């Protein structure tokens, strides 16, 4: 990664500088007992540092959603899969929400993918879709959001930040379950 290539948008001279800064910013927010959902491209720049990066992060519970640069982690027999609590292409989770900051309690569903989708499972039930890949160039629609680090000054998002964004966003019924929609 250099100033000469297309991915110099993050203003680092080397991939090493970039990765060191990401690790520093993640560790400043994500604590040992937190749960981190990483939405892909863990091994951008090559597979040589997969284990090294994982060891430098304080968080013990990291779930990886495969991105287009994670081909060294994808194979079922990859030794790198052991670095993560789980690895998959998409993940749907229901999280217990008990947040004084957001004023919400109960459960909230999330559809996690490296790629942004127009529709996703249970969107008509209020499930929030979180994605990366597009480096902030693909605006969310309805209850979807690009949570890639490019959209948050190279920091991960807290759950409360995401919930706050969708506090007043109505549930989207535009899919095959609503026959009255054009």
Show the residue positions of the predicted features:
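Acidic, histidine-bearing metal-coordination/catalytic regions of metal-dependent phosphoesterases
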Residues: 1-17, 32, 154-182
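Core catalytic region of metal-dependent phosphoesterases/phosphodiesterases
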Residues: 1-97
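Conserved beta-sheet core of the metallophosphoesterase superfamily
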Residues: 63, 79-178
């Amino acid at each position: 990664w250099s100033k000469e290539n297309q991915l110099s948008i993050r203003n680092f001279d080397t991939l090493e500088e970039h990765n060191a800064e990401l690790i520093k910013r993640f560790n400043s927010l994500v604590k040992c007992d937190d749960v981190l959902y990483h939405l892909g491209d863990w091994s951008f720049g090559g597979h040589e540092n997969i284990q090294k990066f994982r060891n430098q992060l304080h968080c013990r519970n990291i779930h990886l959603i495969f991105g287009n640069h994670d081909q060294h982690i994808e194979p079922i027999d990859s030794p790198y899969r052991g670095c993560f609590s789980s690895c998959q292409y998409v993940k749907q989770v229901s999280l217990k929400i008990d947040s004084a900051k957001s004023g919400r309690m109960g459960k909230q569903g999330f559809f996690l993918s490296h790629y942004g989708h127009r529709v996703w499972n249970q969107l008509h039930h209020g499930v929030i879709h979180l994605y990366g890949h597009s480096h902030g160039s693909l605006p969310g629609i309805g209850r979807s959001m690009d949570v890639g680090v490019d959209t948050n000054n190279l920091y991960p998002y807290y759950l409360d930040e995401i919930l706050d964004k969708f506090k007043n966003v109505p549930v989207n019924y535009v899919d095959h379950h609503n026959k009255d929609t054009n």
